[in-house]
């Protein structure tokens, strides 16, 4: 049964029972009894007697009643409706102790008997039965009166008191009548009984007790005395505490209440219930004097909280208000009496649309009373009365094969890949046959030749399916493997139902559509262009349907076809609605069929999976993929690809003109305008050919739950981009299979924690970790403590089941965990169609492809990103789309490319079947000009929230600190997001406005202080499944370190790195829905472990920079922005110099000048002696500038695998920590000119002091390996080249030991990383090419001078980099290797090959010592392109090992460095550091 308004407790739940006795004379009840029918009141308790002499009431068991409580029963005997005297007589009749049943007076039951009798309830409900009991008791002492004349056999004063109208009105005005009303023009009433009975009346006690024992068989004859009377004072009950109203007929027009013991007119009608103002007439309800047959097998009768009866069909797991036993006794509509409705019909009193009628059996609505309609047709000689009349085959339905009428046909069919080749219809109710609708051409059934349309399916492989549901039979066919045979028994002789204009049809296919649940295959698929004025449209059953004219649709002359489908009943004009669906164990819970405007929802089979979907909705998009041009089977395949539990948004068209096979029935008999199809292909909708009021009058809102949900959203404070989901779970032995988190404070929400493997929640598939728990069995949990929530779950466990309402965040465009298709996210960049479009979208004509020619400059890329679907798309769908267009790029300037456009060819070569890597390579090979063949995507306007569109969200598209938009388009980052036309490490993915943020601490990622709303901007979720060794990532930070939580490392081949969306340096904002702000490191681990095999992380993209413990001040974001504090806006020249590796950057032979120069303009003043041609593809560049890291760190390589990306990220991570220590390397890395703009440059003033520059700090010294090589070789680009091998041991130590903030642990890890780094560094030097460079080795004297001029820097604050002091003993041999790590590598590769082996051996030893000393400045001459290739090979080796390889080191005595804030170096120290480079000019 669908969810209705949340109900409060019925008065029945407040009934109290107790056993009382009294100390006194027998029969002297110890409590005062007040009220009574003679006063028009229920009997109720007065004060309890406490006289010591006798009559004192004593409660034996139960809770003592309170004075004023209404007395309902005494020892099980109802006393409501009895006089006070008779009530006391019943009490005295029993021995003490006696059992009393009482209830506190409320809004429904109070002392006023007249009030309760004036209310109208559903027949069979608790209240309706109580009303009948009251009347039974009343008629013991009173006789109803009427103004009509006596009928034959009626005795005045026995059956009725026959009085005049004047006498009746006098009684009514005097208040002597408990009930009054009219029926058939006559007045009826029930007078109050006299307080004292006449001497001729028998004692009522015997009658009360006797009738109570034989209640089911011996109904007293006046129980329905006023059952047909139209009450003058009828009203709806007001439940206690504003309960939902359980009574119905709020209009008060219940033709209900006459009474006569022998008149059948009195025994048939009952007003029925509705949650609104409606009446469902159960006029065929079995009366109490009739013996009811048992319910059908697996049916159950139950009561709602308000006492209303409903029926549960366990066969189909559905509920209904209709008694299945009454179906066989249902009358034809024309045989019903006035005021009576046929079985299954309901009367709706709607304040907006007036009165209309609902046929629940056929899901139809109409304004005309079906009984009046049927009688009118009968008078006109029309035999056919539409769906209200039972179909012929329904009247002959049987579950017994022996009672079938017709010829039995047996067939054996072999299942092909396309199924069995026939469609089925029927099975919507247990009393309906399943019949063959069509036999598909060339299918197994057609080849067998034995099956024909109309055949009733009797038996499948020996299992009788008569009475089975549609879904059950489809599932049986699905379970048959391909190439296996199935034996069918069919019965020929039953025609197909006449009312099959739009039936539920299922193709019995090999992979039948969504769930085994009635996915339909229509016979005709018409394009709207085919509809021409005057053309005749044939319905599926071959009958002539509607003639299309220039003005619109003319309905058929047959009035029986004039119905309003419930699908269009809720809207007055066409609207596009996005509905989130969840795929259940058996599918999405609905069936589809072809229609002229697309695939239409044929039937709702299981509404819990497709809440909000309605019959008749036209499907436009599935998961943001346009399916209007797809065939029925293609749409089926699209739906089938989603796994169980997947969230699938569906864009549907609802409302507006009905489909061409139906028209709306209006209250008038005027011609019905169902709309024009002239504007179908117009981009702008034409005016509606009918006023909205006509549609409203013909389309009443039928679904009370839908009205409730719509109204609920008006008042409910529901966060945007969330959806609420109801999950019903049955308890297993191990429980419900999930854990609960949160509830630690009054403002803390409750979340779903771990989903237990193989538990009930996991098997159900809908519940997820991090879902916010809203309600448990209808009880809100917001604000409740953790213990209270557990108590609620304990209560639910006792019941064996629980209904959970959870709220889930919707991340538009984000990858759903269950779906590994990135295709689903492609069109989300443009969003989904807006909701206010009023046209009737039709299948658009295929878009014509067009060519777009892009030209780029040498220093830029083409400026677009291609996304490729991982899963094989449906036929005809191009899997490659434009995922992003970079602002200001060639793609943006041309104006012809839009996000979502499909790319079918590159330079005339089709790419439809090519992989993503091949496409990227193809575009890169095109040089500076590329021609794209584009098929424009249909216009999209974003989801309702408007936050889903990349074009609508420039803030997300261009984020500061080089954060890539790729975070919002998750998928295979390495495969999907490489920049087209640029090399791996130089992809130009950001506009100039991105880089200007680098000098603004406010926009840095490090700024995490603020509201949670601000914190979550730009974040994206990642759900990981635990691998054999965990989730594959490690954390840094926590409250105890006074910093946030960051991704520290990614394990090789772990789930995190395979996912491709997590990167080193990303900040963790939430773990399984719980915010991480202010939580400890230990708590973060606990949250991850609590998620079981899955964890849901909300990440904010980082820059690859991981702050050190102590550098991070969560209360002061600027304090963590040490890197940026001294920066000035980056000049464009330096920007391009550091960003674009493919450009030729002029550099000084002494490359320190490039890194230490104050302004980028100074580069122009220095004449370059040598230039270095930079290789574009250098993923091994580990020590490239921080600017490049910040800007393009998030851009994964387009042609390299994860290893390159991981290695790069790890290096950046290390450089980040170096940057925290602020060495000259760091400013160079980050825009060296920028940072050093505020630092006195010793380069020009005191070149002799240059060696001091290298001794600023251990970290700086390590960085200097890159720094110095930059000067000596090709400037910053040279440094970038050498990054692959120049990751310092210091940096590696930080990466390896980042979890431990202690210095001792840092030292241990440092030593280990040093040994590893030294070993790998020596190997990296053995470049097979053997080519050498000149001017690699400087004089030993110069090297010694460098060593001696080194000074220790007290400026560094890194705690873990405390080094040992070593004697500074330098030989010529070692001096030649006192250059930085990169220099050492270069020396080996370009230096003296004769001594290479010796050098390598020494390098291993020196690299171990190097961390304890400051590296010497290295001088490297210009490198050739061949040597760059060698470096690339060496870097590849580094990537394989994931280690950073120091090249050389020299033992230099160093002092301990104490942590502290970074200070700008004084002039003398800096100049001393820089002097050597000047000297070498």
Swiss-Prot record:
What is an example of a Pfam family matching this protein?
Guanylate_kin
* Feature: compositional bias, Pro residues: 191-202
Q: Name one GO cellular component term.
A: plasma membrane
Q: What terms describe the molecular function in GO for this protein?
A: ATP binding; frizzled binding; guanylate kinase activity
GO BP term (any one) = intracellular signal transduction
* UniProt modification remark: Ubiquitinated following interaction with HPV E6 protein, leading to its degradation by the proteasome. Degradation is independent of E6AP ubiquitin ligase complex.
Q: Could you tell me which residues belong to the region Disordered? A: 182-273, 542-570, 821-843, 939-976, 1170-1481
Modified residues annotated as Phosphoserine in this record? 234, 595, 699, 832, 915
Region Interaction with LPAR2 and GRIN2B, as annotated, extends over 851-938
Q: Where is this gene product found?
A: Cell membrane; Cell junction, Tight junction; Nucleus
Q: Show the ranges annotated as biased composition (Basic and acidic residues).
A: 255-265, 1170-1183, 1328-1363, 1375-1386, 1407-1446
Query: Quaternary arrangement and interactors, per the entry?
Result: Interacts with ADRB1, FZD4, FZD7, PTPRB, TGFA and VANGL2. Interacts with unidentified tyrosine phosphorylated proteins. Interacts with ADGRB1, LPAR2/EDG4, GRIN2B and PTEN. Does not interact with HTLV TAX2 or TAX3 proteins. Interacts with DLL1. Interacts with PRRG4 (via cytoplasmic domain). (Microbial infection) Interacts with HTLV1 Tax protein, possibly affecting the transformation ability of Tax.
Q: What does this protein do?
A: Acts as a scaffolding protein at cell-cell junctions, thereby regulating various cellular and signaling processes. Cooperates with PTEN to modulate the kinase activity of AKT1. Its interaction with PTPRB and tyrosine phosphorylated proteins suggests that it may link receptor tyrosine phosphatase with its substrates at the plasma membrane. In polarized epithelial cells, involved in efficient trafficking of TGFA to the cell surface. Regulates the ability of LPAR2 to activate ERK and RhoA pathways. Regulates the JNK signaling cascade via its interaction with FZD4 and VANGL2.
Q: State the protein's name.
A: Membrane-associated guanylate kinase, WW and PDZ domain-containing protein 3
Which organism's genome codes for this protein?
Answer: Homo sapiens (Human)
Q: Which gene encodes it?
A: MAGI3
């Amino acid at each position: 049964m669908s969810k209705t308004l949340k109900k409060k407790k019925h008065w029945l739940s407040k009934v109290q029972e107790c056993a009382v006795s009294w100390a006194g004379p027998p029969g002297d009840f110890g409590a005062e009894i007040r009220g009574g029918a003679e006063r028009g009141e229920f009997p109720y308790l007065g004060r309890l007697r406490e006289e010591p002499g006798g009559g004192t009431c004593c409660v034996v068991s139960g809770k003592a009643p309170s004075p004023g409580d209404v007395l309902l029963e005494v020892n099980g005997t109802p006393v409501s409706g009895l006089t006070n005297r008779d009530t006391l007589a019943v009490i005295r009749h029993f021995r003490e102790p006696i059992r009393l049943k009482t209830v506190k007076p409320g809004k429904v039951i109070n002392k006023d008997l007249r009030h309760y009798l004036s209310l109208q309830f559903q027949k069979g409900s608790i209240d309706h039965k109580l009303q009948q009991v009251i009347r039974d008791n009343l008629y013991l002492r009173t006789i109803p009166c009427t103004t009509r004349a006596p009928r034959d056999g009626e005795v005045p004063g026995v059956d009725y008191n026959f009085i005049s109208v004047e006498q009746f009105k006098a009684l009514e005005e005097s208040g002597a009548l408990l009930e009054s009303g009219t029926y058939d023009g006559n007045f009826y009433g029930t007078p109050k009984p006299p307080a004292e009975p006449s001497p001729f009346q028998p004692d009522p006690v015997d009658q009360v007790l006797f009738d109570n024992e034989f209640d089911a068989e011996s109904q007293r004859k006046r129980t329905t005395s006023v059952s047909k009377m139209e009450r003058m004072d009828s009203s709806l009950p007001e439940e206690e505490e504003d309960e939902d109203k359980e009574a119905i007929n709020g209009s008060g027009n219940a033709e209900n209440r006459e009474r006569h013991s022998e008149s059948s007119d009195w025994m048939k009608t009952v007003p029925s219930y509705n949650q609104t103002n409606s009446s469902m007439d159960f006029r065929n309800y079995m009366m109490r004097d009739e013996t009811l047959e048992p319910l059908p097998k697996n049916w159950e009768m139950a009561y709602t909280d308000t006492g209303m009866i409903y029926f549960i069909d366990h066969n189909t797991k559905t509920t209904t208000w209709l008694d299945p036993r009454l179906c066989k006794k249902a009358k034809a509509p024309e045989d019903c009496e006035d005021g009576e409705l046929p079985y299954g019909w309901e009367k709706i009193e709607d304040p907006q649309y007036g009165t209309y009628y609902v046929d629940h059996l056929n899901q139809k609505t109409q304004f005309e009373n079906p009984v009046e309609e049927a009688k009118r047709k009968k008078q006109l000689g029309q035999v056919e009365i539409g769906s209200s009349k039972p179909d012929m085959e329904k009247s002959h339905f049987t579950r017994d094969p022996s009672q079938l009428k017709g010829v039995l046909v047996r067939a054996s069919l072999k299942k092909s890949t396309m199924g069995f080749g026939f469609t089925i219809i029927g099975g919507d109710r247990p009393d309906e046959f399943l019949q063959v609708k069509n036999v598909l051409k060339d299918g197994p059934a057609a080849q067998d030749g034995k099956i024909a349309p109309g055949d009733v399916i009797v038996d499948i492989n020996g299992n009788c399916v008569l009475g089975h549901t549609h879904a059950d039979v489809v599932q049986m066919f699905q379970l048959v493997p391909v190439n296996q045979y199935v034996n069918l028994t069919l019965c020929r002789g039953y025609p197909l139902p006449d009312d099959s204009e739009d039936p539920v049809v299922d193709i019995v296919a090999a992979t039948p559509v969504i769930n085994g649940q009635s996915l339909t295959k229509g016979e005709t698929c018409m394009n709207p262009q085919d509809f021409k004025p005057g053309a005749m449209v044939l319905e599926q059953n071959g009958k002539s349907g509607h003639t299309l004219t220039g003005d619109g649709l003319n309905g058929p002359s047959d009035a029986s076809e004039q119905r309003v489908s419930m699908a269009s009943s809720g809207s007055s004009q066409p609207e596009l609605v996005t509905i989130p669906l969840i795929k259940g164990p058996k599918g999405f819970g609905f069936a589809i069929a072809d229609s002229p405007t697309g695939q239409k929802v044929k039937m709702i089979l299981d509404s819990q999976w497709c809440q909000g979907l309605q019959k008749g909705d036209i499907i436009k998009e599935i998961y943001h993929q346009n399916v209007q041009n797809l065939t029925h089977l293609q749409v089926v395949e699209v739906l089938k690809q989603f796994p169980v539990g997947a969230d699938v948004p569906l864009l549907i068209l609802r409302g507006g003109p009905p489909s061409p096979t139906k028209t709306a029935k209006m209250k008038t008999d005027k011609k019905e305008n169902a709309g024009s199809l002239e504007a179908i292909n117009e981009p702008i909708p034409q005016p509606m050919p009918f006023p909205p009021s006509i549609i409203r009058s013909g389309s009443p809102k039928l679904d009370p739950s839908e009205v409730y949900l719509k109204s609920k959203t008006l008042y409910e404070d529901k966060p945007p981009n969330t959806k609420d989901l109801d999950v019903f779970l049955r308890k297993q032995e191990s429980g419900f299979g999930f854990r609960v988190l949160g509830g630690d404070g009054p403002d803390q929400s409750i979340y779903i924690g771990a989903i237990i493997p193989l538990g009930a929640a996991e098997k159900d598939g809908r519940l997820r970790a991090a879902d916010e728990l809203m309600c448990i069995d209808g009880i809100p949990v917001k604000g409740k403590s953790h213990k209270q929530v557990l108590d609620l779950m304990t209560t639910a466990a006792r019941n064996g089941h629980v209904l959970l309402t959870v709220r889930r965040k919707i991340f538009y465009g984000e990858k759903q965990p269950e779906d590994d298709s990135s295709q689903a996210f492609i069109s989300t960049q443009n969003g989904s169609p807006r909701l206010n479009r009023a046209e009737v979208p039709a299948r658009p004509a295929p878009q014509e492809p067009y060519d777009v020619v892009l030209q780029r400059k040498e220093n830029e890329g083409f400026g677009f990103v291609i996304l490729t679907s991982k899963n094989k798309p449906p036929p005809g769908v191009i899997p490659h789309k434009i995922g992003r267009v970079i602002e200001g790029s060639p793609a943006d300037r041309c104006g012809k490319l839009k996000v979502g456009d499909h790319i079918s060819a590159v330079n005339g070569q089709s790419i439809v079947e090519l992989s993503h890597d091949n496409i990227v390579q193809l575009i890169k090979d095109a040089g500076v000009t590329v021609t794209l063949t584009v098929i424009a995507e249909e216009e999209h306007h974003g989801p309702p929230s408007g936050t889903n569109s990349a074009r609508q969200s420039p803030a997300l598209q261009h984020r500061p600190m080089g954060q890539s938009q790729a975070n919002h388009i998750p998928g295979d980052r390495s495969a999907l997001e490489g920049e087209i036309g640029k090399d791996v490490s130089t992809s130009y993915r950001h506009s100039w406005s991105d880089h200007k943020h680098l000098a603004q601490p406010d926009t840095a990622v490090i700024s995490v202080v603020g509201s949670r709303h601000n914190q979550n901007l730009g974040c994206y979720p990642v759900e990981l499944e635990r691998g054999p060794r965990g989730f594959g990532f490690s954390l840094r930070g926590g409250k105890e370190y006074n910093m946030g939580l960051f991704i520290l490392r990614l394990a090789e081949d772990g789930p995190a790195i395979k996912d491709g969306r997590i990167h080193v340096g990303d900040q963790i904002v939430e773990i399984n829905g719980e915010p991480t702000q202010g939580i400890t490191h230990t708590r973060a681990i606990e949250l991850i472990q609590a998620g079981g095999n899955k964890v849901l992380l909300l990440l904010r993209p980082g820059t690859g920079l991981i702050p050190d413990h102590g550098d991070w001040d969560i209360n002061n974001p600027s304090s963590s922005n040490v890197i940026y504090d001294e920066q000035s806006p980056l000049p464009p020249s330096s920007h391009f110099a550091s960003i674009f590796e493919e450009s030729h950057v002029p550099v000084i032979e002494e490359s320190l000048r490039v890194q230490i120069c104050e302004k980028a303009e100074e580069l122009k003043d220095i004449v370059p002696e040598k230039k270095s041609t930079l290789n574009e593809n250098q993923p091994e560049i580990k020590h490239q500038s921080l600017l490049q890291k910040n800007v393009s760190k998030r851009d994964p390589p387009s042609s390299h695998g994860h290893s390159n990306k991981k290695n790069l990220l790890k290096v950046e991570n290390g450089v980040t920590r170096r940057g925290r220590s602020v060495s000259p390397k760091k400013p160079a890395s980050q825009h060296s000119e920028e940072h050093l703009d505020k630092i006195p440059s010793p380069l020009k003033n005191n070149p002799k002091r240059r060696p001091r520059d290298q001794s600023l700090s251990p970290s700086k010294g390590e960085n200097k390996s890159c720094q110095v090589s930059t000067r000596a070789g090709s400037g910053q680009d040279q440094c970038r080249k050498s990054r692959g091998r120049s990751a310092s041991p210091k940096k590696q130590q930080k990466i390896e030991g980042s979890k431990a903030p202690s210095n001792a642990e840092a030292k241990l890890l440092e030593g280990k990383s040093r040994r590893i780094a030294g070993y790998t560094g020596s190997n990296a030097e053995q470049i097979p090419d053997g080519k050498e460079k000149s001017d690699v080795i400087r004089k030993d004297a110069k090297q010694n001078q460098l060593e001696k001029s080194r000074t220790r820097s007290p400026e560094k604050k890194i705690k873990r980099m405390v080094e040992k002091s070593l004697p500074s003993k330098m030989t010529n041999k070692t001096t030649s290797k006192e250059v930085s790590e990169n220099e050492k590598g270069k020396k080996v590769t370009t230096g003296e090959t004769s001594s290479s082996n010796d050098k390598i051996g020494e390098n291993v030893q020196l690299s171990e010592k190097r961390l304890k000393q400051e590296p010497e400045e290295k001088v490297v001459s210009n490198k050739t392109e061949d040597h760059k290739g060698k470096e690339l090979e060496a870097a590849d080796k580094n990537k394989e090992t994931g280690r950073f390889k120091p090249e050389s080191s020299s033992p230099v005595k160093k002092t301990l460095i104490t942590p502290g804030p970074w200070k700008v170096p004084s002039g003398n120290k800096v100049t001393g550091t820089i002097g050597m480079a000047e000297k070498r000019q």
